């Protein structure tokens, strides 16, 4: 039985919108920042690295992000100087996925040059592709690691 519901990330966006992420609503920007943080946490990376990546994206989008990161959860607030948007996100499981982690780090590193001209929905499409990367190791091997 699954006690966690999937997060409908694309529902945070207007699929027909042509607004670039840098001009999008705070809710849309916040959804990207939170999803990036959650995906990194799911790869097995530490809180410092998750927070650093979330801060990098927030800075590129001209907002402030304050995050409390645990082993399986993130509570964060994004502030644009006028409004704020807060969310609490949690994972139903964690693992080590170095392939996905490498892609996520590359995504964050190149965000400024490759994503600031994308819509929020286009960014979630890119994150969907990264999220579909499976671990190179079986659960048994991961358990022995």
Regions found by a protein language model. Give the residues of each.
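Core alpha-helical transmembrane segments of integral membrane proteins
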Residues: 132-145
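Soluble N-terminal domains of membrane-associated systems
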Residues: 1-118
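Short, hydrophobic/aliphatic alpha-helical segments
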Residues: 32-35, 129-130, 145
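N-terminal loops that bind phosphate or other acidic moieties
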Residues: 114, 118-125, 143-145
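Cytosolic juxtamembrane amphipathic/interface segments immediately preceding
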Residues: 124-132
């Amino acid at each position: 039985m699954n006690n966690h519901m999937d997060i409908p990330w694309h529902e945070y966006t207007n699929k027909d919108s042509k607004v670039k992420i840098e001009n999008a609503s705070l809710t849309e920007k916040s959804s990207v920042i939170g999803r990036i943080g959650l995906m990194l946490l799911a790869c097995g990376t530490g809180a410092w690295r998750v927070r650093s990546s979330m801060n990098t994206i927030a800075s590129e989008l001209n907002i402030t992000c304050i995050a409390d990161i645990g082993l399986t959860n993130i509570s964060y607030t994004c502030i644009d100087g006028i409004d704020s948007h807060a969310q609490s996100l949690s994972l139903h499981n964690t693992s080590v996925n170095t392939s996905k982690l490498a892609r996520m780090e590359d995504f964050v590193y190149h965000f400024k040059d490759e994503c600031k001209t994308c819509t929020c929905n286009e960014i979630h499409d890119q994150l969907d592709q990264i999220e579909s990367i499976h671990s190179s190791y079986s659960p048994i091997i991961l358990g022995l690691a």
